[in-house]
Amino acid sequence: MNSIGAIGYISKKPDPNRILKECQDKDIPILAIRAVQAGALTSKMDREPHPSGRDKPDFDDYERAEPFRELAKKWDESPASLAHRYALSTQKVSSVILGVKNTQELKECLDTENMSELDEEKIKELKNLFT
């Protein structure tokens, strides 16, 4: 997932993988945001597309994330939980900002935080989905 969302003031698309590697190499803690990629890594989008089309990249990412949802189902986990576990399992991620809208989503995130980190095999399988 590479959508930066509706942020319109960035003139060049950042390379999240390069930034992540630089932070890891330089021992810089990472604050993870958009762990569920504005809803793309959840079971369903909870909103309609904006008439201006400004959130089209988020909806495109949702379509591209179908293999991710299938993998979450195979592992008997919700897509949102798996996305948060992936973020929490990433080397040098110190915190994850949650984008929850209700207490049910908050509870799921808190439950996820108490789960074990993903093992290397699962992390590799997830990375292979989008490379």
Model-derived features with residue positions:
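Beta/alpha (TIM)-barrel catalytic core signal, keyed to glycine-rich beta->alpha loops juxtaposed to Asp/Glu
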Residues: M1-T131
